[in-house]
Regions:
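Short glycine/proline- and aromatic-enriched beta-strand/turn motifs that initiate or cap beta-hairpins
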Residues: 43-80, 131, 136-139, 144, ...
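Hydrophobic, lipid-facing positions within transmembrane beta-strands of outer-membrane proteins
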Residues: 72-78, 122-126, 185-189, 197, ...
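Transmembrane beta-barrel domains of outer membrane proteins
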Residues: 79-81, 127-131, 190-194, 202
Length: 229
């Protein structure tokens, strides 16, 4: 007869992850609902649709060692700029981001490896901004605020080739074995210029406050994202 011994530390980690996911889902739902209700009830809201370049930096720190991974792609989405008072506005929105990275190595011309990482995010920013008229039809803005980010998917595809024979392996980075949280609360800001209420040029940066490493040990994992568009 055998008895299965449960790992109490692993159970505790999974329980903490479940609690974290539950709380973040509630916060995400609340911010999304509040943003859409606010945008829909304010008559003076100015809608805008944007697309641009995105660069994400994922930093994992363990002790004194820090490893960084850069992914590039694009973002697309929309927001409502709602006037609160005077030059002060708030702009809730919803955006989708696609980020990718590809690395290839060859060993002695005999073994080739290729690693592709792809991530998909849904983000709900609530940015407060102050506008300043620079000239007729041109408005400069400085903005800052929180963004709630949710990882829709994150996959790593590994392809190895030896003497002409190849094999592909696809990894779900959100699998429990990889201790990678989907949710993040980011804080950031940037500057923008509006041209005749038709075109906006924007440069912004957001930094993730949540440690996305969900396992045990003295390890932290944070993500930052640069948006230009």
């Amino acid at each position: 007869m055998t008895f299965k011994v449960w790992d109490s530390s692993r159970i505790s980690t999974k329980l903490n992850n479940l609690i974290f996911i539950f709380i973040m889902k509630k916060v995400f739902s609340f911010i999304l609902a509040a943003s859409m209700m606010l945008a829909g009830t304010v008559a003076m809201a100015q809608p805008s649709i944007g697309i641009g370049f995105a660069n994400s930096t994922d930093k994992v720190k363990s002790g004194s060692t820090t490893n960084s991974t850069n992914l590039s792609g694009f973002y697309v989405g929309g927001s409502y700029n709602i006037n609160l008072a005077g030059a002060l506005n708030v702009a809730p929105g919803v955006y989708y981001s696609l980020l990718t990275k590809s690395d290839a190595d060859s060993y002695f011309g005999l073994v080739d490896t290729k690693v592709d990482v792809t991530e998909h995010y849904l983000s709900v920013p609530v940015m407060f901004n102050v506008g300043l008229n620079l000239s007729d039809g041109i408005v400069g803005r400085v903005y800052a605020g929180p963004t709630l980010a949710y990882g829709l998917a994150s996959n790593t595809k590994v392809k190895g080739t030896v003497a002409g024979f190849s094999k592909d392996t696809k990894i779900d980075n959100y699998d429990d074995d990889y201790n990678y949280r989907r949710f993040d609360v980011m804080l950031g800001g940037g500057v923008a210029i509006d041209f005749f209420d038709m075109v906006r040029f924007n440069v912004g940066y957001d930094y993730g406050l949540v440690n996305r490493y969900s396992g045990d040990g003295d390890i932290t994992r944070h993500r930052g994202q640069l948006n230009v568009g």
